Amino acid sequence: MVIEELAGHGRALPSGVVAFLFSDIEGSTRLLATLGEAYKPLLADHRRLLRAVWAERDGAEVGTEGDSFFVAFARPSDAIRAARDAQMALAGHDWGATSVRVRIGLHAGEASLEDDDYTGMAVHLAARVSAAAHGGQVLLTEACRALGAEALGATLGTMDLGPHRLKDIPDEVALHQLTGAGLRDDFPPLRTMERYRTNPARATDQLRRTRERGE
């Protein structure tokens, strides 16, 4: 991944155990081809909305390229809340006749910081988690869910999607979907190497149990 902008967008980059967030617009190439020059103000609105969320939740923007963001958070709970807030901000914006859906992936772990850039498997894993999501969906690893548990409760929860194979990641990764008021919960199987296998009734029942635990 090529990063065009670094240095936290005015914020110091956190170190140690860091929560990483990757996001991008689903079908951005199709939108560009359809909208032409009208895509530029759409992209500008997208960036403005999300940058406001990152700043509100103490996120450090590591980089952006086109319609994607790479953001680091010192507290995984802030990353989880930021992902929720981002989807709410996007859903509440008037996009006219265009549908703009953003996929978000989260992972928390140790990463090396050198010359205002991160290296390590934690970064790559977060990017792969984002790539597995659908527009409007927030996926997070078990590590991020556990470390950011204080963000979860009556209004924000997770649904266990089980283990998945992600491209270039040697081991299966346990993934969760962020759930809560205002967040979509009806998505196709994840875009993973081995797609999530369940039946709709089981998935609905699992979501109901997750919400009941949150209440």
Feature names for model-found ranges:
Residues M1-S15, T179-E215:
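Intrinsically disordered or compositionally simple regulatory linkers and C-terminal tails
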Residues V2, R47, L152, L156, ...:
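Generic secondary-structure transition motif, activating predominantly at the C-termini of alpha-helices
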Residues V2-A82, M88-A89:
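Catalytic NTP-binding/metal-coordinating core of nucleotidyl cyclase/transferase enzymes
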Residues E5, P41-L42, T155, D160, ...:
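Acidic/proline-rich low-complexity IDRs
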Residues S28, L113, L183-D185:
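Short, acidic Gly/Pro/Ser/Thr-rich loop/turn segments
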Residues L35, H93, T155, L190-M193, ...:
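Low-complexity, intrinsically disordered/propeptide-like segments
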Residues R51, F70-G180:
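Catalytic beta-strand-to-alpha-helix segment of the class III nucleotidyl cyclase homology domain
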Residues W54-A60, V138-R145, V173-G180, M193-R202, ...:
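Low-complexity, flexible helical/coil segments
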